[in-house]
């Protein structure tokens, strides 16, 4: 692998999983060095907890792949934190990465509290600090998660990574936590 610092992912669609040999697709991903599956329910037009994906999640759990999903956007409600809680609870050994601190656009700590309690949940901070002026709710949300379960993310190409990094460093977070 030319860039071992990057962890590549594939994707799969709920309709494809229901109609095709998704196990072969996941095996192909693993054979080609992909370690996880990224889904974006808003763009792919299905719910994060669509039961057609449950056999896929079960196979991912069995083969130690991880799931990363866009999470949030209360305007459409196909990927809210409640849906990620359902998946992470049904598959407790599946590592799940919820993007945008677990609830893009709904910056209320209470909404993500059930998500933050699950040991197999990780989050990234992509597109979290770019849309709001008051950072306090976001910092409160971050405080609910195990700091070892929070990843930097830029949401590239929507946001330039260096600008997101600058905003993150300007938050005044203790340097040890930023590591």
Residue ranges of predicted features:
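Mid-to-C-terminal alpha-helical segments outside catalytic/metal-binding sites
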Residues: 144-151, 158-179
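Mid-domain alpha/beta scaffold segments of enzyme catalytic cores
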Residues: 1-55, 59, 63, 121-124
């Amino acid at each position: 692998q030319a860039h071992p610092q990057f962890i590549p992912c594939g994707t799969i669609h709920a309709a494809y999983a229901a109609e095709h040999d998704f196990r072969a697709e996941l095996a192909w991903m693993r054979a080609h060095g992909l370690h996880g599956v990224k889904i974006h329910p808003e763009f792919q037009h299905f719910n994060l907890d669509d039961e057609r994906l449950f056999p896929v999640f079960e196979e991912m759990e069995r083969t130690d792949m991880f799931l990363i999903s866009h999470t949030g956007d209360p305007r459409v409600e196909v990927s809210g934190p409640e849906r990620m809680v359902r998946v992470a609870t049904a598959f407790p050994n599946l590592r799940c990465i919820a993007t945008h601190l677990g609830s893009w656009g709904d910056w209320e700590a209470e909404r993500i509290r059930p998500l933050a309690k699950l040991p197999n949940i990780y989050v990234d901070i992509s597109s979290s600090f770019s849309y709001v002026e008051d950072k306090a709710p976001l910092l409160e949300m971050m405080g609910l998660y195990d700091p070892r379960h929070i990843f930097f993310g830029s949401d590239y190409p929507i946001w330039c990574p260096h600008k997101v990094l600058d905003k993150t460093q300007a938050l005044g977070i203790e340097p040890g936590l930023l590591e």
